[in-house]
A protein has these predicted regions:
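Flexible loop/turn segments at secondary-structure boundaries
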Residues: 36-37, 57-60, 69-70, 77-79, ...
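Catalytic phosphate/nucleotide-handling subdomain of diverse soluble enzymes
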Residues: 64-66, 83-84, 200-264
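A glycine-rich phosphate-binding loop feature that marks nucleotide/adenosyl-phosphate handling sites
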Residues: 56, 143-153, 204-214, 264-275
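Acidic, glycine/GT-rich loop-and beta-edge segments that sit at the periphery of enzyme/chaperone cores
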Residues: 16-33, 250-294
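Short beta-alpha connecting loops at secondary-structure transitions
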Residues: 20-24, 76-84, 107-114, 172-176, ...
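Active-site core segments that coordinate phosphate-bearing ligands/cofactors
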Residues: 41-52, 61-159
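Short, small-residue-biased leader/transition segments that mark boundaries at the very start
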Residues: 2-5
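Phosphate/ATP-binding catalytic cores across multiple sugar-kinase/actin-like superfamilies
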Residues: 33-36, 40, 181-203
């Protein structure tokens, strides 16, 4: 978990420079998280604080009392618009939000351009709207009998499976809903497991920091309606953006920063979710879409 210094020529940078890598916590929680936690000021807070970096992997660090506990979960690429039928990364023409009002489906796109796909914020917004309008149930299944007459955007493929038709060439399927459900289950189960391991309750956490580029584009409404975050965190969320980059700047500008980051990484205890005896039950519970959050 210690920092290391290497010749910059090893990684294609100016040959007479030295490159310092920041310390990490484990093979699953790297130096980007150490830098991010340091930049957030989490360790200076006298209350219980949760730091979450959301990407293809979800890394979390919980500060409770004078202890630090970390874990990592496999979120998957769905929240970044990948592994989705018509998904794409955020860019011009990406659908970034949906609304269902009076049984009609509307959307907005990045740059107000013609829709060409759905990015991560749009993927979450779609599931949020489907839940709000009871089009999908707690298991993520589209309620065919109840909805097929009420919404003209519900269509059926050749095998009779329902899907959401946005445009002729842009759609959202049950498999896409499942990908979001798996991502939601991973993040929420990680949070629940951390809290359980720390022997505190969700309500005992006073601040939740969301880091990473993805987090700042997602509305609070989407986070809580879909259930990525428990309702106990409502009004406690703060978006920090790219904390890894901020931490790297701090390491360059403050001669004590790297030493402090090393202390932080050594102090943080990492545990694997799969090693928890009851993790299967925690994950199964976290998979379900909960109507209480809507």
């Amino acid at each position: 978990s210690e920092m290391c210094i290497r010749d910059s020529s090893d990684i294609g940078i100016k040959s007479d420079a030295k490159v310092t890598t920041l310390p990490h916590i484990s093979g699953f929680v790297g130096s980007d998280i150490v830098a991010g936690v340091y930049a957030s000021g989490l360790c200076k807070d006298d209350k219980n604080v949760l730091f979450i970096d959301i990407g293809t992997n979800g890394e979390m660090v919980l500060k409770f009392g004078d202890k630090l506990l970390a874990t990592s979960c496999a979120t998957g690429p769905a929240l970044e618009g990948m592994n989705i039928s018509c998904g794409m990364r955020a860019g011009e023409g990406a659908i970034d939000n949906f609304c269902i009002d009076e049984n009609k489906l509307s959307y907005t796109t990045v740059g107000n351009k013609k829709a060409v796909g759905i990015c991560g914020s749009g993927v979450l917004a779609m599931v949020r709207e489907l839940l709000k309008n009871n089009i999908i149930n707690g298991r993520g299944a589209i309620d065919i009998e109840k909805q097929k007459k009420a919404y003209d955007f519900i269509d059926f493929d050749k095998s009779g499976k329902p899907f959401i038709k946005i445009l002729d060439d842009i759609y959202f399927t049950s498999k896409d809903i499942r990908q979001v459900q798996l991502a939601k289950g991973a993040i929420l189960s990680g949070i629940l497991a951390l809290v359980s391991e720390a022997k505190i309750e969700l309500k005992d956490i006073s601040k939740v920091y969301i880091a990473g580029q993805f987090g700042k584009y997602i509305s609070v409404d989407s986070f809580f309606c879909v259930g990525l975050l428990p309702i106990e965190f409502f009004d406690k969320v703060e978006y920090l953006g790219n904390t890894a980059l901020t931490g790297a700047y701090m390491a360059l500008l403050d001669k004590y920063a790297i030493e402090d980051m090393s202390l932080l990484s050594n102090k943080t205890e990492f545990f694997e979710l799969s090693r928890l005896d009851n993790y299967d039950r925690i994950f199964a519970k976290a998979l379900r879409f909960n109507g209480e959050n809507i």
